[in-house]
From Swiss-Prot:
InterPro entries: FAM50A/XAP5_C, XAP5. It comes from the Eukaryota. Belongs to the FAM50 family. GO terms for biological process: chromatin organization. Residues 137-160 are annotated as: Disordered. This is Protein FAM50B. The keyword S-adenosyl-L-methionine does not apply. It holds the Pfam family XAP5. The modification N-acetylalanine is found at A2.
Amino acid sequence: MAQYKGTMREAGRAMHLLKKREKQREQMEVLKQRIAEETILKSQVDKKFSAHYDAVEAELKSSTVGLVTLNDMKARQEALIRERERQLAKRQQLEEQRLQQERLREQEHRRERKRKISCLSFALDDLDDQADAAEARRAGNLGKNPDVDTSFLPDRDREEEENRLREELRQEWEAQREKVKDEEMEVTFSYWDGSGHRRTVRVRKGNTVQQFLKKALQGQRKDFLELRSAGVEQLMFIKEDLILPHYHTFYDFIIAKARGKSRPLFNFDVHDDVRLLSDATMEKDESHAGKVVLRSWYEKNKHIFPASRWEAYDPEKKWDKYTIR
């Protein structure tokens, strides 16, 4: 076996050149063979054409004895031509099969030569190159360890499954939220003009404070002269000493467990009354009735109790420490 003295890179380049030259030589041989076959086929067609009719003429002469009619002569001639064409077709088929077998043997021969070329090895006498080759073989033998945790690697199937589950949970949560927002609740309030006038209004938990005030205003206009010309934007809703913005929904306060100065803004659980237990450390969760007031009244009386204690609602502000008075 041939030996090659040089670096691994030069050995690879030499192998590449050998394969390239072998491929070019094979292409040239195929081209030459194709040209030769076409030339032979053309000459054979011409020869077969003339030989075919010569043989038919000779056969017709030998088989015709004495006088025959023109129709008999034509019938014999046509029969001989058909028989001769059948024989030529069979002979051509056998010739094509032989050529096909030769091509298959040639292809097998080429594959064998390619295999032998790919099996060529080069003996490298350089110790560094030998070490590199050994290292490359060791690296090539490395495989995947089935015990290694690959959960942190990207996985399209796993990501699609997680996205599907996440979307299902989101839709389930949305449906549950809409169901809660559609539930009705009863809001107790007092129209406050210095004294309380308690009323109740039923609204959905998804309604805004403004929608609640609109309902409250419709029920109070007939009883209070100053409300007949008032609009919703002129009203304020105070709950647990906090002025609630018009754009917030009751659902927002309930889901966030929003608190006023002394207790939750909206809580539907029943707890013991702290006044009965005489324990100032226990919260009484029953919320007070809210107050609906005209903004003009508040501006005139905000320095007087109870308006002096009212503050704008701030979701970031905590009221955990308080005393019940």
